[in-house]
């Protein structure tokens, strides 16, 4: 995995209760939002109240395999760690992130890395890549959820062709 220069803007501010809003607005249930789930998981683990308002300005296309919801969850974990004075190297943060989604731990660190298992087990971390132009194309009409993509793959798995070659190139 490697991060690209495309991001949502996640703003976390103190509030009377936990709320999550997206710009543009979405009819997706707030309680299912990964940022909301991350705030709840952090509060439960650290015995705190997640009295925050999370505003997410969406720029990462949904259902494009770019980790948009996972980046938002990671941003909330980082924001609450900072707000509550929790050391960013606390291993519990990775555990909390993993409970939200397999790729959320990657977005806590965002260093190029090779993950194994369900995509949640760090095998190798690499130094930052030099700035490389990347073109991303995501047609409006074409979308597939990550869950659906993995379900389809599991129905007809294809063995990876020399994943070590990709890792060596990094």
Predicted region positions:
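ATP-binding N-lobe of GHMP and related small-molecule kinases
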Residues: 1-64, 82-94, 128-130, 138-142
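Gly/Ser/Thr-rich beta-alpha loop segments that engage phosphate groups in nucleotides
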Residues: 35, 65-71, 103, 119-121
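Alpha-helical scaffold segments in soluble metabolic enzymes
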Residues: 37, 41, 79, 148, ...
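Short, small-residue alpha-helix embedded
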Residues: 70-83
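ATP-dependent small-molecule kinase catalytic core of the GHMP/sugar-kinase superfamily
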Residues: 86-170
């Amino acid at each position: 995995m490697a991060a690209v220069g495309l991001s949502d803007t996640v703003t976390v501010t103190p509030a009377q209760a936990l709320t999550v809003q997206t710009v543009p607005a979405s009819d997706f249930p707030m309680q299912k939002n990964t940022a909301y789930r991350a705030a709840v998981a952090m509060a439960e683990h650290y015995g705190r109240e997640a009295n925050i308002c999370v505003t997410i300005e969406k720029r990462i296309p949904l259902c494009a395999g770019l980790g948009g919801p996972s980046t938002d969850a990671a941003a909330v974990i980082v924001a609450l760690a900072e707000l509550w004075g929790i050391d960013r190297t606390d291993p519990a943060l990775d555990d909390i992130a993993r409970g939200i989604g397999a790729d959320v731990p990657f977005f806590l660190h965002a260093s190029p890395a090779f993950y194994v298992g369900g995509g949640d087990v760090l095998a190798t971390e690499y130094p930052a890549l030099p700035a490389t132009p990347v073109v991303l194309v995501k047609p409006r009409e074409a979308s597939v959820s990550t869950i659906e993509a993995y379900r389809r793959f599991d129905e007809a798995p294809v063995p990876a062709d020399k994943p070590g070659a990709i890792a060596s190139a990094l």
